[in-house]
């Protein structure tokens, strides 16, 4: 196929799609140019079905540093493991694509997005999401798309689609919404305490824009799309299925209705073991033994899936006996750990998270050096999910995509209420340790994080709580669930996480397993989530009503002063000589940023105060009209030079020493003498003139005698 080009104007920028020129051996490939961002997307599919019990979809988002005209860091000077942002973007693309493959599809699919050029004002992640859907749609891979995604900002009461970097900086909302032509199927958002009404409007505005992109994709697919390949889907033997349902469904139904998680798992496992044992014995010598046993396991999974959903939709019974809008028992505790800077333990049913706060100087802030300009990240929220939290063994090692994603969600939810750097000059790290999990552990980590921040004396604007909402839908009827547990997440259609304060929403995240949900469901889920959020905030308030007025004794003491940017070099000195001398003298640690914010860190408050005085003296400038207690440092015939402070001298001209005539400066002043002077002039070269006589009373003028007539 020769090169073909398609283009449209979207959100004020040219969107260009090129096919048929590069990566032609992939099942489908496109080059997407949006503004000056360029992304190559290639989609490939294995020829055979994989043997696993899940759909092996892999989505990558690769940031090439040359795209921004930068060298990679590190010794090897080449790209290494994906950055956190790249990992989050890969997840962002994976989530709306995954539901668009048929049930039982097991061929391995890889979608590789490579950022070739980067424009911070034209979203490369959204170009990659568009390219991922389009590469799959024009290929022979059986993908039930297209989908598309957009970013939405909210500035001065107006919604902006795919904002520029400057617009996003001014926005009260950072929202990514994706979906099909019919409905939304993925949401990721951080917000500055916005109402449910504004968030819902933003979602709908975003979906309108999504539909524009889908229409463009459909035009391209009509023009160049390949015929879809015939692939084998994982399907069970219907006769075997009917037999197992007839003989074992009643026992499995009873097991599913056991309310306590561990007991329910034991009961369902016991039923499954009986069934599996029965068929293992029956078909041990059968030539299709492996296929039959795979079918048995899949049938049992389908039976459990169907029963959980039937109980909720028909009988309104949840696995643990709760009402559809009922939260599990809650408990909140602070100061769980000694020595640390702050800690909070939050428990919701059988889900429990411990959050631990650490404060440090801004020098410990994380330096982010990606495609965007380098910056310092002040707040970090890390999420750990050990396998013991679900009573299992498993892999231990570096954080995976799920842990990175859950940590980022908590970070977005909590960073909206953090104090400004000027008010609280600390780098802040929260670590959430999931100690038990039966669903919604990411939201428990947000609640525990609020407790740890408040217990540690971080003056947050308001407490934040999070709740996970679920959905069971049969296409006609649906049930929205509050505070979903693991089984409801696993067998349900939606995981919709909502975090916020009493004033509004600070974070949203939605993943679904069906092709989309309606505005009505979104509105109902947001309303139920608000009610639940307020209940949880009441419990957090019971543990700690407001942030402590003081930091923990173990927390570092940090003070901050602001200096003019042109004075930074004065404080640092030649080769760092001045700042090194201050540190050696006071024993503190000093961090200075490019905006002139000076952070002083020490366990000794007196040392901090001494350092502030030294720096204030270094950057101090003489001002006309101010009085200084000065020391004479040099005497000349025309006057005396006096030191006002540090390295700032002034000239007291001979005529400014006294109101009476001074014949000889040396007769009046001597080196080392201390005198009070007033600054009367500073010229354009910074030279200072001072006066002694300006501080002395002016003698009265002598009366001239009248002439006699």
Curated annotation (Swiss-Prot):
Residues at which Mg(2+) binds: 489, 495
Cofactor names: Mg(2+)
GO molecular function, one term: polyribonucleotide nucleotidyltransferase activity
Gene Ontology CC terms, in alphabetical order: cytosol
Residues of the S1 motif domain: 625-693
Keyword Metal-binding: yes
Keyword Acyltransferase listed: no
A GO BP entry: RNA processing
Reactions catalysed: RNA(n+1) + phosphate = RNA(n) + a ribonucleoside 5'-diphosphate
Entry EC number(s): 2.7.7.8
Reported function: Involved in mRNA degradation. Catalyzes the phosphorolysis of single-stranded polyribonucleotides processively in the 3'- to 5'-direction.
HAMAP family: PNPase
Annotated family: Belongs to the polyribonucleotide nucleotidyltransferase family.
Protein name as catalogued: Polyribonucleotide nucleotidyltransferase
Organism name: Streptococcus agalactiae serotype V (strain ATCC BAA-611 / 2603 V/R)
Source taxonomy: Bacteria, Bacillati, Bacillota, Bacilli, Lactobacillales
């Amino acid at each position: 196929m020769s090169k073909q080009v398609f283009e449209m104007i979207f959100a004020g920028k040219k969107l260009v799609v090129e096919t048929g020129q590069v990566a032609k051996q992939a099942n489908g490939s496109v080059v997407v140019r949006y503004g000056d961002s360029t992304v190559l997307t290639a989609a490939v599919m294995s020829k055979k079905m994989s043997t696993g019990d899940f759909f092996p979809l892999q989505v990558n988002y690769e940031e090439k540093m040359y795209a921004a005209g930068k060298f990679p860091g590190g010794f090897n000077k080449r790209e290494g493991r994906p950055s956190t942002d790249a990992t989050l973007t890969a997840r962002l693309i994976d989530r709306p694509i995954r539901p668009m493959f048929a049930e039982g599809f097991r061929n391995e699919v890889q979608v590789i997005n490579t950022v070739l050029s980067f424009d911070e004002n034209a979203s490369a992640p959204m170009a990659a999401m568009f390219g991922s859907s389009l590469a799959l749609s024009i290929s022979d891979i059986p993908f039930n798309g297209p989908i598309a995604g957009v970013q939405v900002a909210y500035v001065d009461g107006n919604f902006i689609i795919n904002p520029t970097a400057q617009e996003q900086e001014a926005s009260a909302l950072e929202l990514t919404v994706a979906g099909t032509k019919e409905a939304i199927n993925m949401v990721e958002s951080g917000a500055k305490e916005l109402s449910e009404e504004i968030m819902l409007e933003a979602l709908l505005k975003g979906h309108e824009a999504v539909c524009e992109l889908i229409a463009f994709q459909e035009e391209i697919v009509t023009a160049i799309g390949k015929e879809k390949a015939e692939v084998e889907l994982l399907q069970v033997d219907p006769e075997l299925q009917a037999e197992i349902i007839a003989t074992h469904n009643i026992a499995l139904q009873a097991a599913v209705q056991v309310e306590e998680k561990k007991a329910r798992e034991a009961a369902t496992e016991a039923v499954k073991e009986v069934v599996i044992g029965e068929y293992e014995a029956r078909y041990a010598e059968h030539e299709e033994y492996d296929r039959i046993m795979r079918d048995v396991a899949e049938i049992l999974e389908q039976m459990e899936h169907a029963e959980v959903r039937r109980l909720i939709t028909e009988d309104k019974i949840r696995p643990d006996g709760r009402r559809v809008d009922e939260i599990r028992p809650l408990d909140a505790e602070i100061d769980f750990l000694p020595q640390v800077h702050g800690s909070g333990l939050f428990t919701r049913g059988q889900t429990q998270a411990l959050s631990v706060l650490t404060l440090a100087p801004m020098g410990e802030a994380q330096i982010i050096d990606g495609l965007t300009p380098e910056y310092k990240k002040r707040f970090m929220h890390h999420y750990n999910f050990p396998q013991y939290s679900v009573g299992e063994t498993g892999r231990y090692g570096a954080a995976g995509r799920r842990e990175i994603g859950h940590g980022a969600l908590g970070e977005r939810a909590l960073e909206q209420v953090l104090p400004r750097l000027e008010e609280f000059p600390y780098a802040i790290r929260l670590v959430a340790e999931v100690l038990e999990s039966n669903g919604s552990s990411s939201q428990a980590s947000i609640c525990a994080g609020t407790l740890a921040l408040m217990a540690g004396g971080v003056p947050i604007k308001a407490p934040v709580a999070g709740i996970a909402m679920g959905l069971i839908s049969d296409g006609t009827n649906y049930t929205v669930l509050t505070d979903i547990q693991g089984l409801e997440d696993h067998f349900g259609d939606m995981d919709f996480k909502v975090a916020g304060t009493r004033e509004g929403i600070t974070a949203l995240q939605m993943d679904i397993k069906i092709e989309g949900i309606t505005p009505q469901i979104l509105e109902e889920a947001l309303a139920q989530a608000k009610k639940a959020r307020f209940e949880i905030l009441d419990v957090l308030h019971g543990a700690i009503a407001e942030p402590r007025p003081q930091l923990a004794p173990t927390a570092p003491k940090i003070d901050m002063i602001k200096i003019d940017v042109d004075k930074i070099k004065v404080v640092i000195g030649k080769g760092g000589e001045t700042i090194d001398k201050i540190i050696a003298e006071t024993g503190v640690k000093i961090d200075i940023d490019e905006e002139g914010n000076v952070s002083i860190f020490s366990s000794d408050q007196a040392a901090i105060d001494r350092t502030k005085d030294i720096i204030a003296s270094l950057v101090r400038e003489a001002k006309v009209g101010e009085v200084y207690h000065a020391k004479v440092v040099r005497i000349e015939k025309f006057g005396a030079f006096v030191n006002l402070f540090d390295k700032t001298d002034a000239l007291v001209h001979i005529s400014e020493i006294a109101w009476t005539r001074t014949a000889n400066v040396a007769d009046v002043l001597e080196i080392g003498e201390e005198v009070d002077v007033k600054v009367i002039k500073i010229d354009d070269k910074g030279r200072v003139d001072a006066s002694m006589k300006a501080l002395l009373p002016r003698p009265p003028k002598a009366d001239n005698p009248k002439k006699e007539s």
